[in-house]
From Swiss-Prot:
Cofactor note: Binds 1 Mg(2+) ion per subunit.
Descriptive protein name: Bifunctional protein GlmU
InterPro entries: Bifunctional_GlmU, GlmU-like, GlmU_C_LbH, Hexapep, Hexapep_transf_CS, MobA-like_NTP_Trfase, Nucleotide-diphossugar_trans, Trimer_LpxA-like_sf
Any Pfam family hit: NTP_transf_3
Binding residues annotated for UDP-N-acetyl-alpha-D-glucosamine, in chain numbering: 13-16, 27, 78, 83-84, 146, 160, 177, 235, 341, 359, 374, 385
Enzyme class: transferase
C-alpha cells in the first residue's frame, strides 16, 4: 500500500501450532466454510498491500505452502517457534529490504478482520506520524488476551494474561490487545534486538515492542475498536465455531439483501467465493462451497451439497443431491438423491433422477436418466433415454474407456454397456443386455440369455 505520505506492507504470523485446537493440522489451515482460515486474512490484506505481504510459517510449513501453492505468496520460515517477536525478527530482513515505511503485523488466526479496520489503524498511526500503533478492544471477559496498560490515558505497555501481576501493574483492565500492529520500520528496527524471553512462556513477545517504544520516547497509539468480535483471534474449536457462525450469518445476510431467496436461512452455509444471482432460491439445510455459481431462478432444494459447480439460470437441484465440479444447464433437473461428480454436465432440459451417479459424463439436451444408473466417461445424445439400472462399465482394471450414445437412443433397464462402445442414433437396446459391441444407427440390440419356461413338477 502507498499513499502520498508513506508506503506499507504486511507480515502475517502463521507459524504457531495451535495446541488448543487439538488437531494435527496447523491452526491457520483450520477450515471456515470450506476455506482455510488464513485465506480470509489474505482476502482482507490483498486489496490494501498488493504483493508486499510476507507470511511467517513454522509448524506444518509444508502443509501451508501446499494449501496455497497455486497462489503468489511469499513465505518466511521460522524454524523454531520461539514466540511472536521472534517470528517478526525472522521476517524483518524482507521488510527492510522492501523499502516500505510501515509494516502491518497481524496474526493468521483473525479470519474475520475487515479491510476497513486495517484502514482505520493505518489512518490513526501512519496518517498521524506515530511510530507504533495497535488495535485494542474492551471486553467484559478479557480471558487469555494480552492486557493494555495505560498511564494517564496513554499506552504504557501490553502484558500477556499469564504474566499480569496486579501488584506490579495495577488493577486488571478490560482493554485487550487484538494482536494487530502497525510499526514504523525505521523506528522499530533498533527495538527488535532488545526483545527478551524473560516471561512465563520463555518466548519473545511482539507485545514487548510497545513497552520498549514507550521507554524510548516513541509515539504509540492504541486504536480503540470497541468490542468488535470480528477482530478476535481463533484459538479453540469453540472459537472456530463462533467465527464460522459469524461469517456464515454475514454471507447469508448479504445474499438476502442482494435478492436471493433463502429459506431456513439459519441452516444454510455459503462459502465466501460462491456467486448467487438475485432471484435464485435456496432451501436449507444445504451447503454451497468453492467457486460455485447459482443463476437467477435456479432452485436448490434442502439437504444438498454443492462445490465448484455451475447451476445456470432456471436449473434445479432437488433434495439430498451432491454436486462437485459439475454443471446443470437452464431447465435441467438433477435429483432427488443424485450424485454429480467432477465433469458431470446436464445440458438444457436434461433429467437426472434419483440414485443416478455421473462422472465425466454429459447428458445432452433433453436426455434422461431417471433412476438407479451409473454414467461414467459417457456422452449421452440429445433426447436419449437411459433405463433404470443401466451401467457404463468404463474401467477395465487399468484404463478408463468412453461410452457414446446417440441422440434419441433408448437403453432398456438393467443394461451393462461395456466400454469402449458406441450406441447409434435412435438405436434400441433391450432390457437386461450386456453390450460389448457397437450398435449402429436405428438398430435393435439384444444380448441376454434366452428365456426357457419349464412345467413345474411336484418336487420342483
Amino acid at each position: 500500500m502507498s499513499s502520498n505520505q508513506y508506503t506499507a506492507g504486511a507480515v502475517i504470523l502463521a507459524a504457531g501450532k495451535g495446541t488448543r485446537m487439538y488437531s494435527d493440522k496447523p491452526k491457520v489451515l483450520q477450515p471456515l466454510l470450506g476455506e482455510p482460515m488464513l485465506r480470509f486474512v489474505y482476502r482482507a490484506l490483498d486489496p490494501l498491500f498488493s504483493k508486499a505481504v510476507w507470511t511467517v510459517i513454522g509448524h506444518g510449513a509444508d502443509m501451508v505452502r501446499k494449501a496455497f501453492c497455486h497462489e503468489d505468496r511469499e513465505f518466511v520460515l521460522q524454524e523454531k517457534q520461539l514466540g511472536t517477536g521472534h517470528a517478526l525478527q525472522c521476517a524483518w530482513d524482507k521488510v527492510t529490504a522492501s523499502g516500505i515505511d510501515y509494516v502491518l503485523v497481524i496474526n493468521g488466526d483473525t479470519p474475520l478482520v475487515r479491510p476497513d479496520s486495517i484502514v482505520r489503524l493505518l489512518d490513526r498511526t501512519a496518517g498521524s506520524g506515530a511510530d507504533v500503533g495497535f488495535i485494542t478492544l474492551t471486553l467484559e471477559d478479557p480471558a487469555a488476551f494480552g492486557r493494555v496498560v495505560r498511564r494517564h490515558g496513554h499506552v504504557a505497555a501490553v502484558i500477556e494474561a499469564k504474566d499480569y501481576d496486579t501488584a506490579q501493574h495495577g488493577p486488571e483492565p478490560r482493554e485487550i490487545n487484538a494482536g494487530i500492529y502497525l510499526l514504523k520500520v525505521a523506528a522499530v528496527s533498533p527495538l527488535l534486538p532488545l526483545l527478551t524471553n524473560a516471561n512465563a512462556s520463555g518466548e519473545y513477545y511482539i507485545t514487548d515492542i510497545v513497552e520498549l517504544a514507550v521507554r524510548q520516547g516513541l509515539r504509540v497509539e492504541g486504536v480503540e475498536c470497541g468490542n468488535d468480535p470480528d477482530l478476535l483471534g481463533v484459538n479453540t474449536p469453540a472459537e472456530l465455531m463462533r467465527s464460522e457462525e459469524l461469517l456464515r450469518e454475514n454471507i447469508v445476510t448479504r445474499h438476502l439483501h442482494n435478492g436471493v431467496h433463502v429459506h431456513a436461512a439459519g441452516s444454510v452455509r455459503i462459502g465466501p467465493d460462491v456467486v448467487i444471482e438475485p432471484g435464485a432460491v435456496i432451501h436449507g439445510p444445504c451447503e454451497l462451497y468453492g467457486n460455485t455459481f447459482v443463476g437467477a431462478q435456479a432452485v436448490i432444494d434442502s439437504h444438498c451439497w454443492v462445490k465448484d459447480s455451475r447451476l445456470h439460470p432456471g436449473s434445479t437441484l432437488r433434495n439430498f443431491s451432491h454436486a462437485e465440479q459439475a454443471e446443470i444447464a437452464t431447465g435441467a433437473v438433477a435429483g432427488p438423491y443424485a450424485r454429480l461428480r467432477p465433469g458431470a454436465v446436464l445440458e438444457q432440459d436434461a433429467r437426472m433422477g434419483n440414485f443416478v451417479e455421473m462422472k465425466k459424463a454429459v447428458l445432452r439436451k433433453g436426455a434422461k436418466a431417471s433412476h438407479l444408473t451409473y454414467l461414467g466417461d459417457a456422452d449421452i445424445g440429445s433426447e436419449a433415454n437411459i433405463g433404470a439400472g443401466t451401467i457404463t462399465c468404463n474401467y477395465d482394471g487399468v484404463n478408463k474407456h468412453r461410452t457414446v450414445i446417440g441422440e434419441k437412443a433408448f437403453i432398456g433397464s438393467n443394461t451393462a454397456l461395456v466400454a469402449p462402445v458406441s450406441i447409434g442414433k435412435q438405436a434400441l437396446v433391450g432390457a437386461g443386455s450386456v453390450i460389448t459391441k457397437d450398435v449402429e444407427d436405428g438398430e435393435l440390440a439384444i444380448a441376454r440369455g434366452r428365456q426357457k419356461n419349464l412345467r413345474k413338477t411336484r418336487h420342483s
